[in-house]
């Protein structure tokens, strides 16, 4: 049973998705929704725990918030590795993160300090692994990005914790979902 799921993956810039109307986001959100519903219905999912990065993590929060009407037991935690996490982002992106933090069930920065060193990011990974039963990643190992660090950390963790699951949503799956969406939009 996976009651606590870490969801992470590509950042928006890695996918070339720079605005909320980008069709790639619809595809990724559909993939997330399908996978989260499966976890809710079949694996006893109670908590989605994610970070605040622009891209997969924020899309996960938005998707999960939308699922709460059908799955009111679902809880969402948006965790940050350090305080002032979005300090270098433009105003629009900072406001969006602040808004998301008010709409989830729990949000906290693990370190009360501003960014000091990569150890804060490693501590964040360790926290996420320790406080979840498995991970869902929008990630394709054949197309590495910044999420490769999380992917490798999860694989290393699995060596010591073989019950910790990892499911990836890769580009082949995203292509299939994109094709489904296109079929649905066709006027028959």
Curated annotation (Swiss-Prot):
Q: Give the NCBIfam families listed for this entry.
A: PRK13660.1
Q: Which Gene3D superfamilies match?
A: 3.40.50.450
Q: Which InterPro entries match?
A: YspA
Q: Which family does it belong to?
A: Belongs to the UPF0398 family.
Q: Name one Pfam family in it.
A: YpsA
Name of the protein in question = UPF0398 protein OEOE_1093
């Amino acid at each position: 049973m996976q009651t606590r799921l870490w969801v992470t993956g590509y950042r928006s810039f890695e996918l070339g998705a720079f605005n909320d109307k980008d069709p790639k986001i619809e595809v990724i959100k559909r993939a997330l929704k399908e996978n989260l519903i499966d976890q809710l219905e079949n694996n006893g999912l109670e908590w989605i725990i994610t970070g605040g990065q622009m891209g997969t993590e924020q899309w996960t929060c938005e998707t999960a918030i939308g699922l709460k009407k059908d799955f009111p037991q679902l809880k969402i935690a948006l965790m940050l590795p350090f305080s002032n996490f979005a300090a270098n982002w433009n105003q629009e992106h900072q406001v969006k993160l602040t808004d998301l933090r008010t709409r989830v069930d729990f949000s906290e920065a693990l370190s009360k300090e501003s960014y000091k060193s990569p150890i804060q990011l490693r501590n964040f990974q360790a926290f996420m692994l320790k406080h979840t039963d498995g991970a869902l990643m929008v990630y394709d190992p054949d197309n590495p990005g910044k999420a490769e660090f999380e992917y490798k950390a999860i694989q290393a963790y699995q060596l010591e914790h073989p019950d910790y699951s990892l499911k990836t949503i890769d580009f082949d799956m995203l292509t299939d979902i994109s094709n489904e969406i296109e079929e649905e939009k066709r006027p028959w």
